[in-house]
Swiss-Prot record:
Gene3D superfamilies assigned to the protein according to its UniProt record, in alphabetical order: 3.40.50.11270, 4-hydroxy-3-methylbut-2-enyl diphosphate reductase, catalytic domain
Source organism superkingdom: Bacteria
The protein's name: 4-hydroxy-3-methylbut-2-enyl diphosphate reductase
One record GO biological process: terpenoid biosynthetic process
Reaction catalysed by this enzyme: isopentenyl diphosphate + 2 oxidized [2Fe-2S]-[ferredoxin] + H2O = (2E)-4-hydroxy-3-methylbut-2-enyl diphosphate + 2 reduced [2Fe-2S]-[ferredoxin] + 2 H(+); dimethylallyl diphosphate + 2 oxidized [2Fe-2S]-[ferredoxin] + H2O = (2E)-4-hydroxy-3-methylbut-2-enyl diphosphate + 2 reduced [2Fe-2S]-[ferredoxin] + 2 H(+)
Keyword Iron: yes
């Protein structure tokens, strides 16, 4: 069995920044540090931070007074921000800047009273945060659609004064079809010059298409609640290659590889490389050879840290 590695894979700039914010807050202020929602959707990362003193909660009413709170990379609604401010909580915002970009777009449509359509998955924390940027008191409304059927059934007030945005971690192919359906139904709809799916999601989906074409089985390292990791598995399967989403080497089943000569490995944007290395070592123990890195798009994007953590971490 030969191992092939997708390129790029694993951590993106937004995930790197979010994890580093929690780590630096722990270093500078000491535990406990409260984090609203899992800072990124990866079991290994969350457990590591929990062991260092991070406490993960789903709502601010689980947070005591006079503590530090970090908002996860997925972003939060304006109501959550207002609740934190009203309680005087010290907040560090680990929202991915590319998610913040979508928040700014939605807030602008809200101020203009322009109806907005969000393409995304119901219940995902990024979607909840983005929907929560819209203030309907200005006369508009925000709607959530997941697929073409939702578009066909959507009723809006003013079809000539619409705009759309997208969740950042969607399937590019699926989203393109939904956007086409929106434009067909609402010819005057506005939106970003390109969809809001982030560079890392696009790059990893392009890479897994290449990987699936050169593999008999594809392994996607990522947690089950990771949207972008699930999209990678689905994409490999659509390419006709069996694919499995795994948290790490402990999830591997030897029977998956009985008929496989080429095993492809990729990782979602919230999965650390150490987990990929663990998978490679287990496969090698079962007789796999090599670990060929496929050609791919180089990523050199970084996002800045909050000023207080940048300065105090140098003391």
């Amino acid at each position: 069995m030969q191992i092939k590695l997708a390129n790029p894979r694993g951590f993106c700039a937004g995930v790197d920044r979010a994890i580093e914010i929690v780590n630096r807050a722990l270093e500078v202020f000491g535990p406990p540090i409260y984090v609203r929602h899992e800072v990124v959707h990866n079991k290994f990362v969350v457990e590591d931070l929990r062991n260092r003193g991070a406490i993960f909660v789903e709502e601010l009413d689980q947070v005591p007074d006079d503590v530090i709170v970090i908002f996860s990379a997925h972003g939060v609604s304006q109501a959550v921000r207002q609740e934190a401010a009203g309680r005087g909580l010290k907040v560090f915002d680990a929202t991915c800047p590319l998610v913040t970009k979508v928040h700014i777009e939605v807030a602008k449509y809200s101020r203009d009273g322009r109806e907005c359509i969000l393409i995304g998955h119901e219940g995902h924390p990024e979607v909840e945060g983005t929907m929560g940027q819209y203030d309907a008191s200005n006369g508009g409304a925000i709607y959530l659609v997941e697929d073409e059927e939702d578009v066909a059934n959507l009723q809006v007030r003013d079809p000539d004064h619409l705009a759309f945005v997208t969740q950042t971690t969607l399937s590019m192919d699926d989203t393109s079809r939904v956007i086409d359906a929106l434009r067909a139904r609402f010819p005057n709809i506005g939106g970003p010059r390109k969809d809001d799916i982030c560079y890392a999601t696009q790059n990893r989906q392009d890479a897994v298409k290449q990987l699936a074409g050169e593999s008999d089985v594809v392994l996607v390292v990522g947690s089950p609640n990771s949207s972008n990791s699930n999209r990678l598995r689905e994409l490999a399967e659509r390419m006709g290659t069996p694919a499995y989403l795994i948290d790490g080497a402990e999830d591997l089943q030897r029977g998956w590889f009985d008929q496989a000569a080429r095993i492809g490995i990729t990782a979602g944007a919230s999965a650390p490389e150490v987990l990929v290395r663990g998978v490679i070592e287990q496969l090698k123990a079962w007789g796999a050879t090599g670990a060929e890195e496929l050609d791919g798009r180089e990523e050199n994007i970084t996002f800045s840290m909050p000023k207080e953590l940048r300065v105090r971490s140098l003391i």
